[in-house]
Amino acid sequence: MSRFVVLLMVLFSMGLTLPSCKGEKEKGPTPTGTKSLIPQSPYAMLIVESESCIYCKQLEKDLQRDPQLKKAVEGMDVLRILAESNARVKYRLDGKEGESTEEDLARALGVRAYPHIIFYNSQGEIILRIPGYTSPKTLTCAIRYVKEEFYKKENINQFLQREGCV
């Protein structure tokens, strides 16, 4: 029995450290059990995923394996919610601040395609939405568009064309 308890504690502690192995800032639940989606960095990339979405899994692989994409997300909070989840999240998005389930937030944000990437600043202003999967090259350019504040000067399509990202 004591071996089982020790094994359970070891497995639980490993589960707590796994997100940090990805090289991304995963914000887990707070002591109250609520995950915070309020960025600590100037910009955040919120990925809304679905359990059965194969493109969500591909995006996860891209974020872990593509060197340009890994470099691009440095200094940006990479956050995730699951569209079917009842887990609680605290958010500041689109001029609203509050707490809800991940599922309710995805619905309130009008997410209908997965993965759905939402870039926003630390004040919660949504800068860019990318519904559906996009290639690592295009996503890397979109991250640059946000981080280097090109969104203040031109629309995303002009930027992607000019930079040869599409």
Question: What is the predicted role of each segment?
Answer:
Residues 57-74:
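Typically the conserved alpha-helix immediately C-terminal to a functionally engaged Cys/Sec
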Residues 39-54:
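Short active-site neighborhood of thiol/selenol oxidoreductases, capturing the structured segment around
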Residues 113-129:
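A short, hydrophobic beta-strand/beta-hairpin element that forms part of a small beta-sheet core
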Residues 18-20:
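C-terminal motif of bacterial Sec signal peptides marking the signal peptidase cleavage site
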Residues 22-24:
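Bacterial signal peptide processing site
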Residues 99-118:
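Structural micro-motif
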Residues 133-166:
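Thiol-/selenol-based redox modules, centered on thioredoxin-like
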Residues 70-99:
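Thiol-based oxidoreductase modules, predominantly thioredoxin-like and allied folds used
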